[in-house]
Amino acid sequence: MATARRRKIVAGNWKMNKSVPEALALVRDLRGQVASLGDTVEVVVAPPFVALQPLHVALEGAPLALAAQNCHWESSGAFTGEISAPMLAELGCAYVIVGHSERRQLFGDTDEQVNKRAKAVRAAGMTPIICVGETLAEREANQTLAVVERQVRGALEGFGAKEVAGFVLAYEPVWAIGTGRNATAAQAQEVHAAIRGLVERLYDGETAGRVRIQYGGSVKPDNAAELLGQPDVDGALVGGASLKAGDFAAIVKAAT
């Protein structure tokens, strides 16, 4: 497999948290804490939809990229309550999270729908952060790698090597999200290496060497350095800890 120096990417998924004033205060604080890092780590924040436009304005010139937490696969139409990828691009989003376990578990997102969302994101000129991961029952049944492979294959269906090389994949074991439990560094590395190996089989070594794979699942300041120190862990998708500027900044610094 071709080797590549991959720039770490740390993204904060705020989920359904923070009012617009709270969101503005958080990024103002965060901006000050990560400014000294320069461009060594790519930092991304994914606030609720209502905060995207205000944050786009507030983040002008800042070393912080904006992400949305989901999108519909159609560009427009009679889809009450949905938001399209082109709309998100207009708001300054560089990334869109697709396939998050909460979307799969709570809203029934399928591998096919994740693929359609990813294609819409790409068509709108943004980069998908494609989430995959197993439940506790699947891990205990030794199905982790099979489940993750199915999800990765489904999400990448129809994409070419050059596109995939620029994507971000995120391994987030469902049993570790919001539970306080997290995969060990060795467990994370095993799955990340398997994902990279799958990308090599599906495409080629260069693509596998360039695609970035984040770990998500109870990432905190006290475990970030060990997780991010693994050779195939290229960053973190952070939930609860991203709601506190100090905690999130500490995770970002652990990625340097």
Curated annotation (Swiss-Prot):
CDD domains: TIM. One of its GO terms (biological process) is glycerol catabolic process. Substrate binds at residues 13-15, 178, 218, 239-240. Homodimer. Belongs to the triosephosphate isomerase family. PANTHER family: TRIOSEPHOSPHATE ISOMERASE (PTHR21139:SF42). This is Triosephosphate isomerase. It comes from Myxococcus xanthus (strain DK1622).
